[in-house]
Amino acid sequence: YLFYYFKPKLEFDFKSLFSEISKKEMYRFSLFAFAGSLGSVFAFRIDSLMIPKFISMEANGAFSIGVTLASALAVPATGIFILYAPIISNFIKNNQISELDLKYKEISKLLFFIGALLYSCIFLGIDNLFMLLPTHESLTGSIPVILILGFNVLINMATGFNGEIITYSKYYKFNLIAIGLLIILNVSLNLLFIKVLNYGIEGVAVASLISMIVFNLSKLLFIYKKFKILPFDISYLKLILVFATVLLISYYLPILDNHLLNLIYKTIFCLSLNLMVIYKLKLVFSYNFWVEKMIQKLQF
């Protein structure tokens, strides 16, 4: 159908690409973007190089389990970042800072909402889930790593699209500086926790968490300095308080003898209570919009 109505043809005229910016500026941006991407890959893979070197291959296997499960938390964020990338770029291009501020806060709360729901399930259910598996003895040691790295991902989601704001602005070079800071800090803390304090893979996970907090904090402060916007407001603080309270209540619920029942009832209780309270308080605009839309459809 597409080939029939839209005849494909090759064009080698790239003049339209440089109608608004010069080739030099385009090449400079591409170089910094490539260097930043390469630096990010190295920064987030440095642990898998240092653990076999300073601890053991077995420890690296346990750490990799934690990385894989924690990374699953970030899947929704990846899709949302891709979806909103052109919107962010357009706001910055047209200097619509007030609109950018509103979207920044809205998406940050949405990402934290999704991430906190998933992290709560992992926090409450990971131990019982592993106890149901025949290999639970070999998996138990990775639970602290999973929880720390999961919180690491949650912190990254909670700060919203701060990296995208910097990337699509004239301050895109700062991303490379921030990634350089992340690499130096991560390597230094890994050496401290592994070689000096002998904390093993838990120490590596803590090092990653501290590095990620500093990394995101540096970007938040930079964005505030240049644009005078932050992803946090009063409703965001209420959202954090709701999740923390519900998680605490769920954690101290009576423990059942059956691991499967314990896994199901604690996670369902936590999810249900969070969803109801957050809907009633109208803390996440997108969530309330989706729920009300579903209710309207069911009424018809």
Regions found by a protein language model. Give the residues of each.
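Interfacial/gating helices of multi-pass transporter permease domains
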Residues: 25-29, 33, 51-71, 99, ...
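Membrane-proximal transmembrane or re-entrant/amphipathic helices at the cytosolic face
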Residues: 10, 249-300
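Alpha-helical transmembrane segments of polytopic membrane transporters and translocases
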Residues: 31-32, 47-49, 61-81, 109-113, ...
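Helix-loop junctions and terminal segments of transmembrane helices
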Residues: 66, 70-108, 162-168
